[in-house]
């Protein structure tokens, strides 16, 4: 295993970049189907609720496997587990595209999407050990912000390509896009991922090390972060899933125009995660920025609901603002968890974080689809604003970091 002192600064950032690409595959496999909802709804004859349920299937697979993947990451390291998990994800994504091209039933396509979701869980939990193991504390917020660009960038890739390909060549051709991205991520893991060294035991305990305690038993800090993140993911999931339908079906945008706006929004959101990470490094706090972001989320979703109710031309711009705000907190929560639990528990800690968020996404996607079909988008936007409102007072105070560092500045 490579020693910290033997690795260059450039190599650390290359490892982080490869981890970003690996995580981007998860977003494409799990969230990409949402960009086929307009085509499935208007051309394939599915109701909005049925299309939303199909789009949620990869999330169910991901959620079922994320914690087991986290345990394996903590035990065996990131490189080997990512190679295995992305291979499974690639098989599922490829199977879904092949099944759709063969006009197989939606049950068969859904089964393949489920397998793709099962394989996608490891990449999300892998970043904690890389960030804590390879980066000093004053760079971790920025590093995790860069790593967390994977979600909005993955959404941008899907938004820019999948609706256009589906409209011109059908859903089967569009389903090949997540498979191609996953293949690229697998190559990145092979070429670029190196596991950081494990934290050495203190000299006084060598030969008789104390048992590793469960960080969840110490206090409510981790539980509160998980709950807050589960609430804050609701606006993010809603916007990522239904904005294409909102723009194309409700407002008459072309798939190309909608995809371009969403892609630009996601790129800005990705950069916003880096800004949030730098902000948290400057404040030496992960939770205070999360609290500010939650309040901003309430304001943005409420403004979007009002603008859409009155058919304001400002609604698309407000959607973009709300989307950027909705993704800004993720890296901060991930960094706080990884720092608190340490490298030995980062896989499990981030697995619990991801499972909670994806559980909420999977549960709320069909419900929001039904709500939109019943009362329309403005009321659904307003209802979504309640989630960050509830989350704001639940944000915990920062916990003290451990004084030891694995790496030098």
Regions found by a protein language model. Name each.
Residues 33-34, 221-263, 270:
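Extracytoplasmic gate region of multi-pass secondary transporters
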Residues 112-151:
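Cytoplasmic helix-loop-helix junction between adjacent transmembrane helices
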Residues 87-102, 296-309:
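C-terminal ends and interior cores of transmembrane alpha-helices
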């Amino acid at each position: 295993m490579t020693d910290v002192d033997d690795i260059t600064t450039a190599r650390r950032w290359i490892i982080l970049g490869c981890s970003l690409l690996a995580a981007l595959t998860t977003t494409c496999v799990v969230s990409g189907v949402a960009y086929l909802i307009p085509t499935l709804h208007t051309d394939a004859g599915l109701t909005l609720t049925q299309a939303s349920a199909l789009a949620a299937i990869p999330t169910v697979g991901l959620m079922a496997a994320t914690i087991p993947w986290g345990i394996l990451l903590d035990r065996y390291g990131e490189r080997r587990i990512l190679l295995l998990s992305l291979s499974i994800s690639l098989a599922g994504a490829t199977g879904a595209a092949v099944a759709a091209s063969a006009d197989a039933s939606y049950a068969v396509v859904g089964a393949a999407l489920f397998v793709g979701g099962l394989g996608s869980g490891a990449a999300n939990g892998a970043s904690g050990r890389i960030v804590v193991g390879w980066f000093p504390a004053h760079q971790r917020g920025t590093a995790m912000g860069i790593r967390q660009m994977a979600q909005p960038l993955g959404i941008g890739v899907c938004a820019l390509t999948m609706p256009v390909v589906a409209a011109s060549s059908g859903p089967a051709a569009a389903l090949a896009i997540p498979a191609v991205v996953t293949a690229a991520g697998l190559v990145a893991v092979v070429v670029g991922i190196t596991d950081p060294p494990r934290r050495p035991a203190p000299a006084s305990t060598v030969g008789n090390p104390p048992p590793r305690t469960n960080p969840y038993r110490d206090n409510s800090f981790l539980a509160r972060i998980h709950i807050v993140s589960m609430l804050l993911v609701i606006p993010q999931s809603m916007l990522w899933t239904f904005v294409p339908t909102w723009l194309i079906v409700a407002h008459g945008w072309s798939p190309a125009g909608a995809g371009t706006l969403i892609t630009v929004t996601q790129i800005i959101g990705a950069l916003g995660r880096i800004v949030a990470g730098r902000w948290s490094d400057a404040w030496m706090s992960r939770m205070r920025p999360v609290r500010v972001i939650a309040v901003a989320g309430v304001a943005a979703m409420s403004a979007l609901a009002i603008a859409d109710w009155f058919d304001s031309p400002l609604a698309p711009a407000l959607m973009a603002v709300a989307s950027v705000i909705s993704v800004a907190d993720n890296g901060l929560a991930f960094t706080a968890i990884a720092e608190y639990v340490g490298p030995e528990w980062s896989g499990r800690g981030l697995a619990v974080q991801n499972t909670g968020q994806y559980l909420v996404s999977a549960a709320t996607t069909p419900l929001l689809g039904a709500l939109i079909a019943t009362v329309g988008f403005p009321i659904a936007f307003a209802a979504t604003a309640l989630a960050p409102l509830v989350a704001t007072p639940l944000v915990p105070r920062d916990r003290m970091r451990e004084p030891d560092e694995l790496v030098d500045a």
